[in-house]
């Protein structure tokens, strides 16, 4: 059976993966999520929140507000803030999410016509 990596090894893997693929890559997100879980196990919720926030912001930037991954990462971030009893950060991140969501919905899509299509 494969041994579980140490927190330090996970952080090193995350930094290497982030450097190669970026922080919004699926592998980077999964490693950062594991780091977040480890910090939660140690009851270091401030560090867990830090990695959860990085993940959420990277997904929001790369995939947008309507992507299920972004929403799942937001839920994980809120859970970390709850464990840290940081109500202000919960309110802030939820307000930001809905503000961005509303802005996204307000973007007008130009009306297309068939006049410019060449056959």
Regions from the language model: what does each represent?
Residues 1-119:
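Intrinsic-disorder-linked linear interaction elements in eukaryotic regulatory proteins
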């Amino acid at each position: 059976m494969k041994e579980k990596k140490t927190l330090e090894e996970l952080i090193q893997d995350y930094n290497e993966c982030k450097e190669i693929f970026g922080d919004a890559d699926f592998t980077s997100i999964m490693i950062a999520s594991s780091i977040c879980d480890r910090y939660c196990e140690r009851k270091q919720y401030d560090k867990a929140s830090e990695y959860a926030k990085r993940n959420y912001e990277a997904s929001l930037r790369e995939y947008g507000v309507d992507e299920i991954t972004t929403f799942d990462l937001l839920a994980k971030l809120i859970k970390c803030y709850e464990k840290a009893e940081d109500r202000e950060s919960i309110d802030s991140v939820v307000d930001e999410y809905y503000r961005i969501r509303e802005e996204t919905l307000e973007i007008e899509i130009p009306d297309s016509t068939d006049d410019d299509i060449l056959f």
